[in-house]
Amino acid sequence: MGDEYLAEPEDEVAISMWPENIGDKHQKQFKMEKLGKDQDALEDANFQQKPSSVDLNRLMELANSEKGVSQMQYFVKHWEYKRANTARLLKEQIGLLCQQRKEIEQRKQQILEEQQFQDESYYAVKRQVPILDEVYKDEWKRPSKKNDDLSHNQELKIDAEYDSISYWKERAMQLEKTLEASLQRERSLEEKLEENIKNLQSHTPVEEFSGMLKRADYFLHLVLQSAPIVIAHQDADLRYRFIFNHFPTLADEDVIGKTDYEILSGEGIEEMNNVKKEVMASGKATKREFVFNTPLFGAKTFVTYIEPVFSKSGETIGVNYVAMDITDQVTRREKMADIRVREAVQKAKETELSKSLHITEETMRAKQMLATMSHEIRSPLSGVLSMAEILATTKLDKEQYQLLEVMLSSGDLVLQLINDILDLSKVESGAMKLEATTFRPREVVKHVLQTAAASLKKELILEGCIGDNVPLEVTGDVLRIRQILTNLISNAVKFTHEGKVGINLHVLDKQLPGCRIEGGQLHSKAHSAPAAAAEHFSASPRKCDNDTLGCSNHEDACQTGIPSNDNFGEHHEGDEVVWLRCDVYDTGIGIPEKSLPLLFKRYMQASDDHARKYGGTGLGLAICKQLVELMGGTLTVVSKENEGSTFSFVLPCKIPVKEDHSDDPDDMPSSGGDFTTSDIEGSFIFKPQARPYLLTSGVSVMNNTKLIGGNQFYDPPNILEDRKPFSNGFVLAEDHSTNSASTAHQSNGPSVSRTNKEQHDNAMVIELNRQAERVSSSRGDTTSVSGLIHEERGPCRVHEEKSLHKKSKCSPSSNKAKILLVEDNKVNIMVAKSMLEQLGHGIDIVNNGLEAIRAIQKRQYDIILMDVHMPEMDGLQATKFIRSFENTGCWDTSVKPEHDQIIAGSDNLSDCAHMKKQGKRVPIIAMTANSFSESAEECLAAGMDSYISKPVNFQNIKECLQQYLPPQ
């Protein structure tokens, strides 16, 4: 063994291949000894020694099985291998220690020999003994020890006088200590080896296996002790062989060996057993949710995972299942779903509300635009027509009368065109409102034909036929129905040169196909076959096998509901609804087949030749169609060129609860005259040889009655009660057969005087128009009426107006009334002033509402004519101030705060004492060019008594003064 290996052997100790904690590692790796209390965490755990539901017989059966025996043999072989390996390692360590001991002894012997040699030469000559270079080098190269105080960079210097014997003695003592420590470690290892051998001999594989199973069982109980699950095993008969975490009310003997039916009862048990049988039959695992409601644990929801158990031969011998209570999760899930539904509904409502708000805003803007356009256009037109009417009261020659008649007629046409455009715009923007009133269909048809016959100059026969099944009274928008009929009759007269024009009204035996009454609301579907529908409902007096055009290219208005006012279109359960069909037929020029698709489009006519020859804007039929659809009906046409046309519309109408047949004017007998009637058969005819006059002022206003292509004669039921029925059964005119000559002569010029009979007839017509205008003005819509049939009017209108003016002007001066006119437009001031002065009344003029209040404070007036739109203060605000003063006796400044100082400054005026009379109320009449019914409602709400629509005329002003001025 060389010097390099023996260098400093006393400081070198061979490193053992066994760690110091060999016992602990061995115990942790092989678990061959019982762990101490401080090492086994499960030893200190306090398990509840509850009766386990483990089948011990089953466990022993598994241990004695072939697989269990093979596992036991494996554990025995593993234990023997570990024991042999441990003995081998110990022997190797002991051999290494013995070798190190021998080397140390040899080194010690060498040191002793060297020391003896030095002792023998001690008494020789003393000299410095240098250390050999080899020894110096060896000492320098020797690795530093743990307790060595010399640094590697320090030079080794030994004095020659150094005592070598002491040095080597110290070295020997150090080696002795190292050897003793090594021997002590060897003895400790031997003791541990003997102890491990004893421990290995005291343990058997069965005990170790049992301990492992016990620890696993304790761990399983610890994990599943508080888990919300049920684990169970059932055999092929679905009897429990094992269950864990069952309900505490049941003992082991109440569960083991029994089925679900024997343990539980209630909802969900049968369903779960059927699923278990399906799993056993199919051999596939499944996962389901079961809802139980049993007396044992109440209503619960479990999510269950069921898997089959197979034998070695592959047969299904049972099922294992794991069930977890998810009742709280299901409840939260249902709540979340309900919250999501409510959020979706709320979001949908917000979206719908936003859409409705947007639509409402658009509608309001459209209505505002229409109101502005109506006001801005009708105001200057009012000045033109009113001035022309005033001019008609002056002295004119024949040519001037004719020119003035043309001027009035043209103004009427312009005003009618404006009304048509406004009607169409209101329908399309949703601003058109319908009003449900009770009316008599027979009278409507009768007066429409009567109005058309009044100005008819063609050799045509106007006839009407009312079915026996038509009710005496129905509920609907009579003004819109009259507007549709008048327009269709006007077109029929315009395009018919000879023959007849008529109206056929009857009730359908069944309702319109595609329409139904559900929930009190009218619904319909678009018609897929309009031609078939038209042929099915064709009831024209003549055979109409012609081309048919319906409303198929437009969605039926009643599908989305009918815009309503006063519950129009709302049919309550129990209300009887009838479907009225009206056919307007003629024997005129007809309509070419190629023009039928364009018939109901705006600004479209059958051909350019028709437009040049007959005139018109092409809006009449479009408005009729939209009005019919707005009321929930349909409009169709059957026509053939050169053979005539038949326009038919069907409308739903309600029958009033009470009907009184005793005072029906249609049931009165008639005889003689210029027409014949048969009330029993419901038919009447207007013959062409005599046509009664109907006075139609070009600037007269028929409120809420906008007709296309002709005038209208409004005859509300309350007027019918006041009028005297004539001998011919009608209420418009008496027998005019004797007056036809004078009527024809009168049309030649205004200078020819008329007979007393004609004057009486015209006076009757004027009175009827006055009452009609008064009733219809309460509805708010205003329309200028041009003439009964535009191309058929005569020049007698100027003369009649002049005659009416002369009668009005002859009033005595004692009837002079004090009138305040509040108007900012100079033209309107001139018109009203001229008319009022010619009627013999005094007038004061102011330009805005503030000036009107100051004028009222200084003077008492019999009536106030007030414009609505004015600067500084409009008519509505001024009316509120006036009504507030009349009620309280003082000027209330709370109506308009910005005018507090202006109004308050005049409270002390002594001139306003006349206004403080108790109960004194000055009539205030609005003068507006707005054609919307909302304008009338605003006026009445502000405190006004009535209103006059512009353009104004003598008739309107006279009626107003007669109604509201106190009798003189």
Swiss-Prot record:
One BP annotation, GO: cytokinin-activated signaling pathway
EC number per UniProt: 2.7.13.3
First-tier enzyme category under EC: transferase
Residues that span the membrane, as ranges: none
GO cellular component, one term: plasma membrane
Residues bearing the modification 4-aspartylphosphate: 867
PROSITE patterns registered for this protein in UniProt: HIS_KIN, RESPONSE_REGULATORY
Keyword Glycosyltransferase: no
Protein name as annotated: Probable histidine kinase 1
Gene name in the database record: HK1
